[in-house]
Amino acid sequence: MRILIVDDENTKVVEICGVLRDAQITEESITVATTAASALKELKESYFDLLIIDMYLPNRIGEAPSLSGGVDLLKRINRGNDVQLPEHILGLTSNLEALAASEEDFSARSWFVEEVGPSKTTWKLRLMEKLQYLKAREEYQGNQSKSEIISTRPECEVLFVCALLDPELTALHAVSGCDWEVVTFPGDPGIYWSASLKFGANTVSAICVCLPQMGLVAAGVTAAKAITLFKPKLVVMTGICAGRKGDCDLGDIIGANLTWDYGSGKFTEVAGAVVFEPAPFQAAATARVGGVLAELSNDNELLQKLYKESPGYRPAKVPKFHVAPLASGAAVQNHKEFFSGVVTQQRKMLGVDMEAFAIAWACHEALEPQPSWLVIKSVVDFADGTKDSQIQSFGSYISASLAIYAVDRLINR
């Protein structure tokens, strides 16, 4: 594996190399360039599996860094036939202006750009994901057979799935009170975390995974693979969702007792107009999961406790816990007419997300014994175009906290 770091800040290069060392990448595999011009020279002469670019970058030695330096290099790489394209590219910067100027170009090419700073850790997780993928590919190509790969995986009692590294996965790690260890397996590009959850005298083995991207497809594939490999008794998803305005408030929690794909159906023409005819399959939570959700929804003392212990921002009042249907769809919804159209599929529907049904369906179709599924999410917007980014951290915290309590009741009773 060969890695090219393009960065003129020595402090940041040292931090990046620290992550590479943790992933057991040797110094011989790492090349550092301090300008766009020197990086291009390296890319013309050699192939690199991973390219790490600083966004605030000078073009040549002696020139001042430019806010578009990293983006200009990315465009040059994609434009030229004289450059060997790396398999993966990751953008990093501590300059917020450069970050804002580069996000659109990076996302358009399906690459990530992350902020680096004293309190920022997402970039390290993202980099570790890339490294583990590349290492897994190398090991797989080193004649690891499928049976050898699968036999190295431990089984677990609980599998946690989060759609976002930050704030969802970081909140889950924080509230669990455990030391989560990064684990990887030969031939598998995924990165997992393993821990033992302690509930008094009882210990529950747990593995968590973060989706490579949001959405039903990523959630279904990731969950199905993890269920097959780790054989959990329970699959849990925590995080954030949109809620139905007027029936819930920002910060409220939804424990899903029913979920479906609201985009399942067909488009047809009626009197010259295109009409959508829904035909969803609805997956219901087990009676046992539903019972635990009902318990939590009535535990006002627990809700008040978690509200008071919340770090950082919190809503003006203690949130409510609703046990209700949660629909899923493949696209982010951001217009005020959305709920009025979808609620016809299930009049008690209270929220929407992009993953819950995929988790439920992966459990439904799993090899025997099929695991139960549990989805607990917090409302952070109303799918009407209004956003409050402050509430996302609280929503991730409160949903993860309640999920931990639910796991205790479901596994240890």
Curated annotation (Swiss-Prot):
GO cellular component, one term: cytosol
Family matches, as SUPFAM superfamilies: CheY-like, Purine and uridine phosphorylases
Cross-referenced PROSITE patterns: RESPONSE_REGULATORY (PS50110)
InterPro entries: CheY-like_superfamily, Nucleoside_phosphorylase_d, Nucleoside_phosphorylase_sf, Sig_transdc_resp-reg_receiver
Residue ranges crossing the lipid bilayer per the database entry: none
Keyword NADP annotated: no
Residue span, Response regulatory domain: 2-129
Protein's recorded name: Uncharacterized protein y4jS
Keywords: Phosphoprotein, Plasmid, Two-component regulatory system
GO molecular function annotations of the record: adenosylhomocysteine nucleosidase activity; methylthioadenosine nucleosidase activity
Species this protein is from: Sinorhizobium fredii (strain NBRC 101917 / NGR234)
4-aspartylphosphate: residues carrying this PTM: 54
Superkingdom of the organism of origin: Bacteria
GO BP: any one term: phosphorelay signal transduction system
Pfam families linked to this entry: PNP_UDP_1
